[in-house]
């Protein structure tokens, strides 16, 4: 029985239209006739000028169609005006398939519906922009999935996967896209609509029949050449699948033996037709999975063992080499995961997965794997993982492989150009050994990972594409190609042709088949309108004018406000050694190099409830995702958006919805920290344009809060007046829907002069002393939080000091100044804090904070002020309230007499973005679980959307609410009766109060309630 799904799986919120500018007649027509987005400005085009490859070509413009009617209108206009068209999904191509001088049509924002689903037939029809992981999440309740599980599944689209003929980690079991696409509904270059599918049914449409006859004629004529020239390996994606009538792949394209004309479009990179709907073959979800991690003392042994391991019939065998292991260990999110998989210090590991209906059978397979490795001389080398969570965590590390490797600092980066050559398994060890020798010959090293099961290892030589990288790339490519030919492999095994490998199609297939491909292109697209210069008539791979780092690429001179010297280094590609911070050649002192860490792989285009990236989840706009912002910054700092650099309007617009959540700092494997870049951009803009009244009111809150506290009665009266408050909000630029913060008698006013005595260096043990750093908000607006924290700490037997001295203003983290880009003021606050706390830090006293964004700035931005050892010492002693309690409990120094909470059985916990970014969210849940009988339920949400003053600002209110409605507010409204809501961030609490009419509380307040006596 069929069930059709009309609503989109994800219906994005459209918030910020493209900036209007003087438009050509083409774009005036597009904007007039389309309901979707039309972008013609240079910054928008620049964000679509790159993908995850080394290339950059400015498109003519960008169209984001809202529906199928929009798509057809856009294609009609482009055809009438003789404009080339380039279909784009997630833009994660590593070979430049989605880069070109054309009208880019972005399917990912709106064209993402599930059109039809047949559970019994195990088929689904989707629009091209649907994300793979979204599709599989929707299919999961039906016990089905689409098994071409590529590593970019969280962001890649089905349309892009079909255009690329993607493969995935489990292709040894399920095949490639060509094995799993049943039909494609497409629009041809002449505007006609055709359905390409199985030839088991007669073709009746005249246009489709003409194409079929033409393809059959060419394929029949070239049959002998296809048999002779097409590599006999599973992974082979170069050129067109002209062997669809006489399959040369080791795995048959179809189950019934009938040819399928859709398979000619699969892997065609959008050069033949525009796919509007794709019908897929589904597979049952395996009931159980187990994972064996095999540790190898040498890389060669790992490669040699692959041919033996596949005989055990695993569904996946994936490689992680020593470089990727080392880089994973540097990432705090990945380190504990990878450590659990290691035995000693291996040079390589293989992830071997078994899946099926019988768990016992899989456990037997794991035992057989261990026996096999013992027979191969490696007893005890297998780490068995049967827990689903542990398996997923390790697969997530593997899936992040490219991004992890791209986290290398310095100008040299692993470059994609021979990363998916495929060779028969029996030659894999020798191929990798000899290719490594080629790298060494050219004074570089390669990083290896991925698909050992099918002889397709991703390897990227480390090259500096600013300098001699292009020359060495050409030389290495030639020698690698010779090895591939010797071993009868495929030069393009998985990632397609694009700009990088298009010129090698003729080398792989010879002049006859290359000419046949050109004939196919003319048959479908005689005017060369669909993605020109791909597969047929491609440019040279080393055409430097197409590089992201093109000739003349250079940053504008810039003196940053923060310290970026860690990125201004030189790296030896052979040894991996880095020079000292600040020793590189970056004239921006590391800032440009930090921006260039973004490799465009699109990990930030995730849609789940993790940390990154809330503004993208709300808007689905490339402008408002970390990748889009990084590209905007890169274009700006290199003068490609004009002479204004970071102070320009394009940068301001790109960062407009960035809530500085630091999700990218944690989740981006290359460590792109957009919150820190936003500080720099605001600082640069302030120097040119100054600050607004609203910005100054927010920034200087710590300075005038004492006055506001004394005037709290008058302010509360004014805030409650029905005329005064709205006028005040409108004058300042605040959202009328928001309630203004109220002030209270400051907590520290009662702490007294003795709150911060000069400590005695000769004093005894300091294990029972803490300094409670009461932030501006906890002091002047929510003093009950500070009182609760003091009560809990004193109940646990600690002597509590505070961050204030008699007659002085309390110490401040400077966070509000940072948010406004007033870095000099923030540094001044930090310097005062460091100088005052130095005696405590020298004695090892822990600094405990309540507000995550405040306390955690001491572990983050303070280190970028240039204050050296003082800042590092503070970072090592600064803990959030709950982190401190967990540490003390683990050390056996904490005893809290907690009792059950009357009338409260559950705590719904929302994590502040910075808590998540610094792995500080788990301690909140831990301490709450100390309360007897309390069920602790974390909310699966990203940023609450308030983000300090962001949600108060009139122009950002809608975006703020959209972010909150993604996960947080629905979860709060749906909580069980009597459940309390816990949120440590003051902004989070205000958002929950405004959006769900619920008063959330700080964890300290909950613990105070639970104290006995």
Regions from the PLM with identified roles:
Residues 1-80, 90-122, 151, 174, ...:
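N-terminal flexible segment immediately upstream of the FAD-binding catalytic core
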Residues 30, 53-85, 103-152, 162, ...:
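N-terminal glycine-rich flavin-associated loop
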